[in-house]
Amino acid sequence: MNLHEYQAKDLLESYGLKVQKGIVAHNPNEAARAFDQLGGKFAVVKAQVHAGGRGKAGGVKVVKSSQEAREVAESLIGKNLVTFQTDAEGQPVNSVGVFEDVYPVTRELYLGAVVDRSSRKVTFMASTEGGVDIEEVAHNSPEKILKVEVDPLVGLQPFQAREVAFKLGLEGKQINDFVKTMLGAYKAFIECDFALFEINPLAVRENGEIVCVDGKINLDSNALYRHPKLLALRDKSQENAKELKASEHELNYVALEGNIGCMVNGAGLAMATMDIIQLYGGKPANFLDVGGGATKERVIEAFKLILDDENVKAVLINIFGGIVRCDMIAEAIIEAVKEVNVTVPVVVRLEGNNAEKGAKILADSGLKLIPADGLADAADKVVKSLG
């Protein structure tokens, strides 16, 4: 689950980090009042969306008066912001953040952390190249990114943070501020179950203060039951409508841009199914994993979800029966086809637990379903069914 910038800053500030002060505004008049409340000569108005690249897309503007703040807010709120991280429709802007002017600054740094699946540890990344796309830095100048793995038994140690500060070229008060920032960020990461966080840029002001000018936090969705206050910050308007509906039925769904809908049980098999569709010249319209313990109701909802996409011109159902029984899947497919009024070809491959029984149920149903014998045969048939 992603947080908005203003929410991320509030959370980080509660852990002792110095952040760029700001006020969230849900309409132009609130934005104008926020400018006056901040009391500076300048302010920065930022669209609050769950996507990067806001500046290049026109979602970040410097304003010099309350009237300018009102005008910028009016141009953003109620519109969709399209960035390189969104789809063609973009993300809806329901609010803007009006933030204080912290410039001029002497330097812009980068600080972030993720759970590294290889080392199975929280890994911090820091760089002198703040304020730019860190992905570009990683690609063009990987040596400019410092990495620190944190031992989960003892946590992040002050000496590790000081070492990073030295390597970043910080000195005096800046070092102490950076250590406090990094230790506070780690505490927040662990206690709030972050999956990822980024501060870009982390600005070094002329007075030596280190301030978070931006903040990005992604929370581990599997741990949200432990954090009801954080869960209350969820903004469903920023989520893909189909993916949101899928999550309500415990389905793992990701929308893609192809025309062959996929329903599979198991993430690995789903990935393999998409690969072989591509191999045979097709393009998957989605990733959809109904899970190892799929129920009839979940399968029906999955089928509806696939066919809600008007780009879908054929469907491939690939089930390997282990915990889930193929005969139950077959009954759910029949029920879903009848309920949804399917008009596209449906290829079904069943293997494993009660596969023969499931195949017979489908064959006796009288529906125009295309049986497949093996994964390659299924991919070949679904691609050919497109004509």
UniProtKB/Swiss-Prot annotation:
The keyword Glycoprotein does not apply. Heterotetramer of two alpha and two beta subunits. Mg(2+) binds at residues 200, 214. Substrate binds at residues 265, 322-324. ATP binds at residues 46, 53-55, 100, 103, 108. Its cofactor is Mg(2+). It comes from the Bacteria. The lineage of its organism: Bacteria, Pseudomonadati, Pseudomonadota, Gammaproteobacteria, Thiotrichales. Residues 9-245 form the ATP-grasp domain. This is Succinate--CoA ligase [ADP-forming] subunit beta. The keyword Nucleotide-binding applies. It is an enzyme of class 6 (ligase). Binds 1 Mg(2+) ion per subunit. Belongs to the succinate/malate CoA ligase beta subunit family. The gene is sucC. Pathway: Carbohydrate metabolism; tricarboxylic acid cycle; succinate from succinyl-CoA (ligase route): step 1/1. Keywords: ATP-binding, Ligase, Magnesium, Metal-binding, Nucleotide-binding, Tricarboxylic acid cycle. It catalyses: succinate + ATP + CoA = succinyl-CoA + ADP + phosphate; GTP + succinate + CoA = succinyl-CoA + GDP + phosphate. One of its GO terms (biological process) is tricarboxylic acid cycle. One of its GO terms (molecular function) is succinate-CoA ligase (ADP-forming) activity.
